[in-house]
Amino acid sequence: YVVGALARDIAMEILEMPPSPRRTADLDVAIALKDWNQFELLKEHLLENHFVKGKPKQRFYYKGADGNNDYEIDIVPFGELEADEKVAWPPEGNPEMSVKCFKDVMNIADTVVIDDAITVKMAPLSGQFLIKFDTWLDRHLLTDKDAADMLYIMDNFYLAYISFKQPVPDEVQETSESFDLL
């Protein structure tokens, strides 16, 4: 399922909210895997289908059949291969990252249809906030971008909720008048 800044941007566009001041140029995809052998098989499949490997272990670039594209994609494995809610890329266990809430967020992922052609699962804003909070706990001394992303989600999630909130039906409003207040 799609996570990261692009998931945030897609959700905010669907909700017709203002764009984030911090834009992204990559796609982060969380994939539940049984073990690191499955990650290697996935890597081989990507390399056979117009992707090239980037330097970071999770990074790939989609080149396309004509070789003219250069779209960055980070694959974030989680699931049975994690230990203590973290993944650590073999053989040296580096990089290591927390995937503490990825299973829970996957269970509440939204289904999004893009351009009437592509259907993807995507972390909902509440799940994106949880992932950002966990990431902030890991690296808040190194960067403030996760805090800025959380603030943006909180500010705009509330506005989106209010703008899409359904009015209370007249029957409910009328019924409440017939009760005595204590």
For each feature predicted by the language model, list its residue ranges:
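Compositionally biased terminal segments of proteins
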Residues: 1-182
